[in-house]
């Protein structure tokens, strides 16, 4: 049996009412509030059919119905239209991103705070994984005592330094020569480009200073491989205040999840690997048992080919999907624009 138009209208009304009230929904409520032009008796029969089809559930203590996971999934895929953020919300987002930013981590934290504030759920934002960071400058600075400082600047304006022991008989003029040749060869190139096409040329030209070149390349490699994901988590109290998590055991399970940064990082890394657009995971669609009873609305953000991360909103399955997906989509676009400016 398929879902006809009348059943779709009733299912949509039940999902919306349950999202708003967290109370099981009865046929009289649907008839009174949603103007479907159908009698309570007819609605009751349709609700029984929807329950038999697996789209609704009936809690033991109530005659009303609530959406099942399958019901939420059908609503998200077939019945929901993302809501455009209100003008006031757009202004809040615009104002936050116009403020002067000192670092990418500050942008990430600000985004997480915005998401949790605007959605009233928990917000997760992973730091962008740099996939094509380019080298902007290399310099060797003599320190005396047979030591030098290697300085490498990668885009966007990230400075990496390391003190090295110099080979015997190397002069300040030699250090300047190595710095000049390295800059001429690798400035503006990604680590991958340097490995594949440029490194052999550098070794041939600086054969006498191979040991120093290797020190520089070690630091460049380390700076380029610094891709450990960090996760900003905000709005924990928002989600704990939801009726679903007033149960102590459910609260403990959720807190256990939120305390595992590696797990959250893995979850967001998976979302960052998805195609562009919004991803909605509901209930047991998660691979992790700790997230049962929750939903995650996520999207990837970033500068293609350079840095990619993910942002997400975590809430109960009874999430306001239309509002959250609209906000996540809008925030993703704005965050990506900010990062594009930082990575110029």
Swiss-Prot record:
SUPFAM superfamilies recorded: GAF domain-like (SSF55781), Winged helix' DNA-binding domain (SSF46785)
Pfam family, one: HrcA
UniProt keywords, alphabetically: Repressor, Stress response, Transcription, Transcription regulation
Membrane-crossing segments per the record: none
Molecular function GO terms recorded: DNA binding
Gene Ontology biological-process entries: negative regulation of DNA-templated transcription
Family: Belongs to the HrcA family.
Function: Negative regulator of class I heat shock genes (grpE-dnaK-dnaJ and groELS operons). Prevents heat-shock induction of these operons.
Alphabetical list of NCBIfam families matching this protein: hrcA
UniProt-recorded name of the protein: Heat-inducible transcription repressor HrcA
Provenance organism: Desulforudis audaxviator (strain MP104C)
């Amino acid at each position: 049996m398929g879902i006809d138009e009348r059943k779709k209208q009733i299912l949509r009304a039940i999902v919306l009412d349950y999202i708003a009230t967290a109370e099981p929904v009865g046929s009289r409520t649907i008839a009174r509030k949603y103007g479907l032009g159908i009698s309570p008796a007819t609605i009751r029969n349709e609700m029984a059919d929807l329950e038999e089809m697996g789209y609704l559930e009936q809690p033991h203590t109530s005659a009303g119905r609530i959406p099942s996971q399958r019901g939420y999934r059908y609503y998200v895929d077939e019945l929901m239209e993302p809501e455009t953020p209100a003008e006031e919300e757009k202004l809040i987002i615009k104002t936050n991103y116009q403020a002067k930013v000192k670092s990418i981590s500050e942008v990430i934290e600000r985004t997480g705070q915005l998401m949790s504030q605007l959605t009233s759920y928990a917000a997760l934002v992973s730091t962008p994984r740099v996939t094509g960071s380019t080298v902007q400058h290399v310099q060797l600075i003599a320190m005396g005592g047979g030591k030098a400082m290697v300085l490498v600047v990668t885009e966007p304006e990230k400075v990496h330094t390391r003190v090295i022991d110099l080979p015997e008989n190397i002069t300040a003029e030699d250090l300047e020569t190595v710095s000049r040749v390295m800059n001429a060869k690798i400035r503006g190139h990604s680590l991958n480009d340097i490995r594949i096409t440029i490194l052999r040329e550098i070794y041939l030209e600086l054969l006498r200073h191979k040991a120093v070149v290797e020190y520089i390349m070690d630091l460049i490699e380390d700076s380029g491989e610094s891709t450990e994901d960090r996760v900003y988590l905000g709005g924990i109290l928002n989600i704990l205040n939801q009726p679903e998590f007033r149960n102590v055991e459910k609260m403990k399970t959720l807190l256990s999840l939120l305390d595992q940064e590696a797990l959250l990082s893995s979850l967001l890394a998976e979302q960052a690997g998805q195609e562009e657009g919004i991803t909605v995971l509901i209930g047991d669609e998660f691979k992790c048992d700790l997230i049962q009873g929750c939903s995650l609305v996520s999207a990837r953000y970033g500068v293609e080919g350079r840095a990619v991360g993910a942002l997400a909103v975590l809430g109960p399955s009874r999430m306001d999907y239309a509002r959250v997906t609209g906000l996540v989509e809008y925030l993703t676009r704005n965050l990506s624009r900010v990062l594009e400016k930082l990575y110029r």
